[in-house]
């Protein structure tokens, strides 16, 4: 029976605080971190997730990496008997929901932007966003002779070389490849730092000179040299109906609108594909799962235009699956997809945002399972209550426990956001411990669940035409139970 029950066990990881390493790239919280890890071990957690900030490690000068602070943290995690998910965080910390510290990308990279601001994502009014380099410079050798993709690849190579002992020992089991702002595969379409507030539709962010030239060339190749980038999609805090693009019968449904949306979302898919290919080469043979994070854009999901998803780069409509295409690309690399907002209920959302996090989660997970991926989730906002935990449990095993073997569907893992003093307050900690046990199908912690195989080389590149074929028809999601059968 234990073997059958074990097939229902979902691993639980917990994110370490954003500032576990200081902005000076030192580790000063050894005692505090050790105590936190002890609490997580006592709660039965499987491991922790940590942001590995590019801006700290290669912050001083190009090609000079300082891993000493991270090695100290990894050592503590190893001593605690926990596994580690490492995020290759090539974005800035600061400017997004929950960012409590400011860790910019390396100064020498930002210096390139002083003479060439187009290395950064740019909106239609010319505002640049310094959180992450535009995917328009992925292949441009602007950084002391290196392209952006070479910067990311070299960073990962240095990580592999300097953390080889932790990789070999099976401590690091997951490499989440950062692909955009907040480490998510998306455009910076809703930046709080530039005045966006929920539930604004956001903006299309493709007006740096590299992406402008790319669009112009694509339009000419398609026989439409007269097409320019959009000028009718509004600004960050508009509602869809205030814009010509998203309005009923708006531009998004015209040939030009469809061409633009396909181009914009394809650029993002290719960006992820190229960087995952580099990550695969770097970690080849390591016992790690490669992963990416997709953002949970749940506002305006309940209207036909899905405006906020479209500006973020997810070309998802009522008749087009914008997540299945991403999942299909991931099959090439056997990579997993990590999705957010697993704790949210529709009933908790304001009606004017036309928000539907539950349906969104069901769509995205169903798309990933149909493509045969390992899927993971995390919560978007700090929650300590049974309602949130029970929603996560429902999404982790949507058809419930199977006493005779693997459940019909289950998450590969869940990452809880995040370690804090509040989490360890008596009542919160007690509830959290119960939650972990329920995720483990009421079994004790087991370090041998879902062992990770050595990484194999990525398969041949999937042509974009083939990726687009899975977008339509948009299939109904798998049925999800209304409530979990193992509540907290």
Curated annotation (Swiss-Prot):
Pfam family, one: Glyco_hydro_14
Keywords: Carbohydrate metabolism, Glycosidase, Hydrolase, Polysaccharide degradation
InterPro entries: Glyco_hydro_14, Glyco_hydro_14_CS, Glyco_hydro_14B_pln, Glycoside_hydrolase_SF
Gene3D superfamilies linked to this entry: Glycosidases
Binding site for substrate: 51, 91, 99, 293, 298, 340, 379-380, 418
First-level EC class: hydrolase
One of the protein's GO biological processes: polysaccharide catabolic process
Record has Cell inner membrane as a keyword: no
Superkingdom field: Eukaryota
EC identifiers of the protein: 3.2.1.2
Catalyses which reaction(s): Hydrolysis of (1->4)-alpha-D-glucosidic linkages in polysaccharides so as to remove successive maltose units from the non-reducing ends of the chains
Record family assignment: Belongs to the glycosyl hydrolase 14 family.
PANTHER family assigned to the protein according to its UniProt record, in alphabetical order: BETA-AMYLASE, BETA-AMYLASE 1, CHLOROPLASTIC
Protein name: Beta-amylase
């Amino acid at each position: 029976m234990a073997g059958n029950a074990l097939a229902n066990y979902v691993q639980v990881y917990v994110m370490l605080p954003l500032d576990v390493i200081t902005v000076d790239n030192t580790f000063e919280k050894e005692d505090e971190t050790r105590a936190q890890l002890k609490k997580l071990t006592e709660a039965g957690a499987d491991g922790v997730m940590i942001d590995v900030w590019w801006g700290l490690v290669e912050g001083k000068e190009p090609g000079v990496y300082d891993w000493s602070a991270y090695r100290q943290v990894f050592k503590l995690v190893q001593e605690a008997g926990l596994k580690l998910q490492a995020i290759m965080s090539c974005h800035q910390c600061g400017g997004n929901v929950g960012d409590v510290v400011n860790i910019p990308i390396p100064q020498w990279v930002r210096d390139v932007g002083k003479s060439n601001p187009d290395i950064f994502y740019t909106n239609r009014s010319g505002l640049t966003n310094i959180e992450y380099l535009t995917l328009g410079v992925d292949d441009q050798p602007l950084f002391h002779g290196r392209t952006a993709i070479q910067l990311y690849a070299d960073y990962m190579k240095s990580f592999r070389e300097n953390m080889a002992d932790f990789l070999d020992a099976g401590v690091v089991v997951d490499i989440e490849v950062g692909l955009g702002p907040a480490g998510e595969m998306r455009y910076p379409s809703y930046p709080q730092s530039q005045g966006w507030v929920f539930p604004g539709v956001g903006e299309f962010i493709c007006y740096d000179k590299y992406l402008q030239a790319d669009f112009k060339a694509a339009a000419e190749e398609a026989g439409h040299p007269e097409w320019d980038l959009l000028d009718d999609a509004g600004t960050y805090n508009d509602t869809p109906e205030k814009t010509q693009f998203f309005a009923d019968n708006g531009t998004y449904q015209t040939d030009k609108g469809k061409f633009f949306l396909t181009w914009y979302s394809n650029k993002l898919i290719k960006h992820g594909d190229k960087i995952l290919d580099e990550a695969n080469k770097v970690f080849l043979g390591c016992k790690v799962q490669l992963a990416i994070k997709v953002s949970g854009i749940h506002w305006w999901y309940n209207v036909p235009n899905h405006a906020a998803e479209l500006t973020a780069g997810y070309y998802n409509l009522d008749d087009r699956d914008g997540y299945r295409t991403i999942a299909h690309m991931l099959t090439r690399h056997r990579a997993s997809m990590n999705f957010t907002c697993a704790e949210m209920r529709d009933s908790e959302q304001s009606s004017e945002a036309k928000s539907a996090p539950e349906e969104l989660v069901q769509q995205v997970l169903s798309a990933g399972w149909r493509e045969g991926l390992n899927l993971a989730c995390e919560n978007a906002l700090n929650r300590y209550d049974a309602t949130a935990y029970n929603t996560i449990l429902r999404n982790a095993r949507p058809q419930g426990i199977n006493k005779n073997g693997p459940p019909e569907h289950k998450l590969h893992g869940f990452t809880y956001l995040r370690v804090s003093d509040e989490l360890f307050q008596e009542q919160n900690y007690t509830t959290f411990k119960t939650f972990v046990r329920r995720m483990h199908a009421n079994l004790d912690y087991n370090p041998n669940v879902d062992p990770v195989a050595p990484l194999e080389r990525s398969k041949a590149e999937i042509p974009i035409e083939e990726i687009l074929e899975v977008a339509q028809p948009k299939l109904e999601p798998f049925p999800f139970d209304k409530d979990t059968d193992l509540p907290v």
